[in-house]
Amino acid sequence: MAKKNAKKSKNSSASIARNKRATFDYKFEEKMEAGLSLMGWEVKSIRMGKVNLSESYVFMRDGEAFLFGCTIAPLNTASTHVVCDPMRSRKLLLKRKELDKLQGLVDRKGYSIVPISMYWQKGAWVKIEIGLGKGKKEHDKRDDTKDREWQIEKARTMKKAVQQ
């Protein structure tokens, strides 16, 4: 029975959730991977895909990083003896060197730390990809939209030229 479940988890998608808004609102200079400190009911809810990263961010407190604003909806059948708080702040598991680097950049240069995606690593560990970057201004967003539209138009033109 265990072998069936192991095969099923290997074949299933490793991605759990993506923060699509993050790439639109921020220009990332650096990305890194962090572990998450979770409770049992949270892991069960994540396996069922009940995660929302859209309004979440990472903040530093006492030299440690915490994920705030990430909603993990509790399952009805999960835990009856523990009070489930879907919006609690969750500790990120990073090395001291990484934490010091993040703290320095956030304090001095005005960078923000934003979660980009959440995924399974080796089928058992929940990891989160965080990005260190600055917020885009309105004209930066317009430039990105123009570039994207130009790339689409260029691809259409090339496709028509190849077909003729």
From Swiss-Prot:
GO terms, biological process: trans-translation
Source organism, top-level taxon: Bacteria
Gene3D superfamilies: 2.40.280.10
Pfam families from the UniProt entry: SmpB
Coiled coil: none
A molecular-function term among this protein's GO annotations: RNA binding
PROSITE patterns with a match to the protein in the record: SSRP
Functional note: Required for rescue of stalled ribosomes mediated by trans-translation. Binds to transfer-messenger RNA (tmRNA), required for stable association of tmRNA with ribosomes. tmRNA and SmpB together mimic tRNA shape, replacing the anticodon stem-loop with SmpB. tmRNA is encoded by the ssrA gene; the 2 termini fold to resemble tRNA(Ala) and it encodes a 'tag peptide', a short internal open reading frame. During trans-translation Ala-aminoacylated tmRNA acts like a tRNA, entering the A-site of stalled ribosomes, displacing the stalled mRNA.
Family to which this protein belongs: Belongs to the SmpB family.
Protein's name according to its UniProt entry: SsrA-binding protein
UniProt organism field: Shewanella sediminis (strain HAW-EB3)
Classification of source organism: Bacteria, Pseudomonadati, Pseudomonadota, Gammaproteobacteria, Alteromonadales
